[in-house]
């Protein structure tokens, strides 16, 4: 499976993410072992990193954060998410499609 995968039915993007919490800034770093490495400033405490990741991705894709689905990895750094019908495809992610 690729780090970023276009899904036709239902329409959207599936992301495999390696999360780096408590980073100095929010950014998409690049590929890390066939996953998209995402650095965020939120700490990995009481689900704060997951909530912040969803908020960060919702801004990038211009979708409501409630529409993004965390499919796997709620308590791990390795996560799989589904972004339904993104309104914008960020250039940092477009290159990995």
From Swiss-Prot:
Q: Which GO terms describe its cellular component?
A: cytoplasm
Q: Which Gene3D superfamilies match?
A: YggU-like
Q: Which SUPFAM superfamilies match?
A: YggU-like
Q: Which SMART domains match?
A: DUF167 (SM01152)
Residue spans crossing the bilayer = none
List where this protein forms a coiled coil: none
Supply the NCBIfam families for this chain: DUF167 family protein, PRK05090.1
**Family in the record:** Belongs to the UPF0235 family.
Name listed for the protein in its UniProt record: UPF0235 protein HD_0778
